[in-house]
């Protein structure tokens, strides 16, 4: 006789243990071996039962079951540690607010609050100027030097993700005679990797994201919503973010734009996990801290109290408004 497939009833659910042909020829000699095997499988089931249970639950419930709480301790704020990390951050920043112009320049726009970030970018690249735009709360970081443009392209190659920036480099930079030799030394490519385990999203968010806290009063019940939002003309980058962080994508017909929002508490947790590891460098970091603190209050259900709600409503001491 052969023992070809073993099933057992565990925690009220029938679990299929052997999907492959694990067979034991029956004999008195190996009866003990079969018994040991069954015991080991039972132990494995007891360890993995929680994971298997999650397959049948909704995303919200699954998050409640498995999500480890966000720590009240804030990680030390760090900048990218090397050219590779900085290249990912710069690629995200350029994908969001950068432009390779027909004058063979790189131009990145910043809010006037982020002038220190503009000078940091200049220092890391080693080229460029920072220029204030008259009568506007904006500044420009501009690189016109050939060596500076070449360094930027080397830094972001295989790290940036937008086809528009790829086409700008091909048509506005490589097509110009002074970059002819450089274009022969580099194989330009987009980052097609689907994970976000680098600084790209931090740079992209410093350019285009906002951290929103919405307090709603519905049927005499207070509801606090945390929304990390990004608006784009194209949907594909938002789909990448959604695949990694959860959330939803919408479309505004009147503006012909798509928007991503981290609408659930579980998605907010994933947003925090990312930005606690890959830090924002602009003034949006202050907005993120306020947003993160609101999450901690909700996490402990303190938003249901007057004191907790007042803490969420309180302006951040270092900034009056949330981006």
From Swiss-Prot:
Q: Name one GO biological process term.
A: intron homing
Q: Does the keyword Membrane apply?
A: no
Family annotation (InterPro entries)? Homing_endonucl, LAGLIDADG_dom, LAGLIDADG_Endonuclease
**What keywords appear on the UniProt entry?**
Mitochondrion
Pfam hit, one? LAGLIDADG_1
Q: Where in the cell is it found?
A: Mitochondrion
**Name of the molecule in the record:** Uncharacterized cox1 intron-2 37.2 kDa protein
GO MF assignments? DNA binding; endonuclease activity
Miscellaneous section: This protein is coded in group-I intron 2 of cox1.
Mind telling me which GO cellular component terms the entry cites?
mitochondrial chromosome
Lineage top rank: taxon: Eukaryota
Record organism? Schizosaccharomyces pombe (strain 972 / ATCC 24843)
Primary localisation category: mitochondrion
Keyword Lipoprotein annotated:
no
